[in-house]
Amino acid sequence: MKTLLLTFLVVTIVCLDLGYTLICHQVHGLQTCEPAQKFCQKRTTMFFPNHPVLLMGCTYNCPTERYSVCCSTDKCNK
């Protein structure tokens, strides 16, 4: 009986997703998101005319800009 309970406990712990955080691509490497950051983003913006800048990483909400991608799975913003 103890073996059965121990097995059940181990399976329960393995199946639970304790402390899961999202992983997103940045321009250089990967970023582990804060628990409240539920989305990865990839967007192109222009700070100066004819000079596009690529922004990638974790975000709290999805950008609504025209040239942006938002997703919610690990490494989905490549």
Swiss-Prot record:
One of its GO terms (molecular function) is ion channel regulator activity. It is found in: Secreted. Residues 1-21 form the signal peptide. The record marks H28, R43, H51, R66 as: Important residue for inhibition of muscle alpha-1-beta-1-delta-epsilon (CHRNA1-CHRNB1-CHRND-CHRNE) and neuronal alpha-3-beta-2/CHRNA3-CHRNB2 nAChR. This is Short neurotoxin SNTX26. The record marks T45, F47 as: Important residue for inhibition of muscle alpha-1-beta-1-delta-epsilon (CHRNA1-CHRNB1-CHRND-CHRNE) nAChR. SUPFAM superfamilies: Snake toxin-like. The record marks M46 as: Key residue for inhibition of muscle alpha-1-beta-1-delta-epsilon (CHRNA1-CHRNB1-CHRND-CHRNE) and important for inhibition of neuronal alpha-3-beta-2/CHRNA3-CHRNB2 nAChR. Belongs to the three-finger toxin family. Short-chain subfamily. This three-finger toxin binds and inhibits the nicotinic acetylcholine receptor (nAChR). The record marks F48 as: Key residue for inhibition of muscle alpha-1-beta-1-delta-epsilon (CHRNA1-CHRNB1-CHRND-CHRNE) and important residue for inhibition of neuronal alpha-3-beta-2/CHRNA3-CHRNB2 nAChR. Keywords: Acetylcholine receptor inhibiting toxin, Disulfide bond, Ion channel impairing toxin, Neurotoxin, Postsynaptic neurotoxin, Secreted, Signal, Toxin. Its main location: secreted. Expressed by the venom gland. The record marks Y67 as: Important residue for interaction with muscle alpha-1-beta-1-delta-epsilon (CHRNA1-CHRNB1-CHRND-CHRNE) and neuronal alpha-3-beta-2/CHRNA3-CHRNB2 nAChR.
